[in-house]
Design a protein with these regions (language model features):
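Generic recognition of flexible, low-complexity loop/linker segments
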Residues: 18-20, 58-59, 269, 378-380
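Extended charged/polar low-complexity repeat regions
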Residues: 52, 67-467
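Short, polar loop/linker segments at the starts of domains and inter-domain junctions
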Residues: 41-55
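Extracellular/virion structural assembly segments
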Residues: 38, 46-48, 65, 70-71
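Short alpha-helical segments and helix-capping/turn motifs at coil-helix boundaries
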Residues: 14-19, 55-57, 63-67
Length: 467
């Protein structure tokens, strides 16, 4: 649920769902996108290279506790799994995500991930120290391992593995790989400094420390003949968004392309600017044009109070003492205020139209069970224990029922208010194989062994084949 530009009123969080900075075509391409959330989880992963509050796809981290595994995803959420033995898997029904521990050559034949498991290199499947995550039987796998590093001179070998795992690569259902290269030694030890995508392209990620950014700011001030601004050489080691080592991503270069080896760009594909407190301040595209700018709270590092697309008005935000958004100010459009009560959120726009959200559940399982619209109408929703929609009642009192599969959450049946039903059927890979409407007519789909659609039969009998 989002409101305005945008805010998640259920969490009281300022969010930016996904802004893509790099996306070149090809098999299993490297896509660099940014998501932001002002929400603070109770078990945060360390701050990533885009600064507090921000996440990118590579910011997936698994914490290994005594009896618990905590997967921090790139949306800022923390997913809990029980301890896994080699070859065991855990499944989050609320997020439709599997976590599997390596250590076996094959999964049980009846397992939904059995075929996808075989797409992995044998080395990964047999390693009990690696974990693999996916949100679909179609893949891809996120490979969670550890970064190789150069041991200290006095270190006892072999060194124990760390109590966490980081993203080291992706593997799709065709066995194609994307590799994240972590620095083995030096000031950026353990950080991602390179990526090789499924097309064989290599990207170099240029990182900087807080001290390097401070020195650069001083040199720019000297060359410009201005007074240097207050730019500290170090940052506090902890924020509300997790531990912070102060390392940030400053630019991404394409350094190798097998298709165009002699025609590489002479400038970075994207460049980032930073505040003296290590917060993402600006994004520049490959033409060095600033396309985004961000402003943060003076007291709370990483809490966004304004953002702007170049050439558009600046949108501003205000928060309460609990860190929840209370106002969203848009000088060229609708502004919003948010009032939080127990199990009730009131949203009022600048035209004095009001919506009231009645909620049940907590944190990530909080759902809107009743919505009072600005026109006075009311809609209601029912959810199961893991937050999946079971029924919706419209303003006229008509109820539509939904039947999700117990395991996958995929909708298997929809019953409209007049009692007419549509049924949906899926294969072991969660792909739709047939759908029958209230009129009894059927849509059918067929796939090859790799899960690619090869034939579709329309309800009128027309057949379309794909090659």
């Amino acid at each position: 649920v989002t409101s305005g530009h945008p805010v998640n009123p259920l969490l009281g969080a300022k969010v930016l769902p996904g802004e893509t900075d790099i996306a070149l075509p090809g098999p299993l391409p490297f896509i660099l996108s940014r998501t932001y959330s002002s929400y603070r989880t109770k078990t945060p992963a360390p701050v990533g290279s885009l600064g507090p509050g921000w996440k990118m796809p590579a910011d997936i981290r698994l914490q290994l506790r005594d009896n618990t595994l905590i997967l921090s995803d790139n949306g800022g959420r923390s997913l809990y799994f029980e301890h896994l033995f080699p070859g065991e898997d855990g499944y989050s029904r609320s997020e439709s995500l599997w976590l599997v521990r390596g250590g076996v050559a094959k999964l049980d034949e009846g397992h939904r991930l059995a075929a996808l498991w075989q797409a992995l290199p044998e080395e990964l499947r047999l390693s009990p120290h690696r974990y693999l995550a996916t949100n679909s039987p179609q893949g891809p796998w996120w490979v969670l391992g550890w970064c190789e590093r150069v041991p200290e001179a006095d270190e006892v070998l072999p060194a124990p593995l760390p109590p966490y795992r980081v993203l080291t690569g992706l593997v799709d259902r065709f066995g194609r790989t994307q590799t994240f290269h972590h620095e083995a030694a030096g000031e950026f030890s353990g950080e991602i400094t390179g990526v090789t995508d499924g097309a064989g392209r290599h990207f170099r990620l240029v990182l900087t420390t807080q001290a390097q950014r401070a020195e650069e700011a001083r040199q720019q001030a000297i060359s410009g003949g201005t007074e240097p601004s207050a730019f500290p050489d170090t940052l506090p080691g902890y924020t509300e968004y997790g531990r912070d080592n102060g390392i940030r991503l400053s630019a991404v270069w394409l350094t190798h392309d097998p298709e165009y080896p002699e025609n590489l760009p002479a400038a970075p594909l994207v460049r980032y600017g930073w505040t003296p407190r290590g917060e993402l301040a600006a994004v520049y595209d490959r033409s060095n044009t600033q396309v985004r700018s961000f402003t943060y709270d003076d007291k709370y590092r990483g809490r966004m109070v304004a953002h702007r697309h170049t050439g558009r008005p600046e949108i501003r935000y205000r928060y309460d003492s609990d860190g929840r958004v209370t106002e969203q100010l848009n000088p060229a459009g609708l502004s919003y205020t948010y009032q939080y009560e127990k199990d009730r959120i009131t949203i009022t726009d600048s035209l004095d139209r009001r919506e009231v959200l009645h909620t049940q559940g907590e944190a990530g399982l909080k759902r809107v069970v009743k919505k009072e619209h600005a026109d006075g109408s009311v809609t209601q929703s029912q959810f199961d224990a893991v937050g999946r929609l079971r029924a919706q009642t419209d303003a006229a009192g008509r109820t539509t029922e939904y039947s999700p599969d117990v395991v996958t959450g995929l909708i298997t049946r929809i019953t409209t208010p007049d009692g007419r039903a549509s049924a949906f059927y899926y294969n072991h890979h969660n792909q739709l194989t047939s759908a029958t409407g209230p009129d009894g007519l059927e849509l059918r789909r067929e796939y090859d062994e790799s899960g690619r659609l090869i034939q579709e039969t329309a309800p009128d009998g027309d057949i379309t084949r794909y090659r």
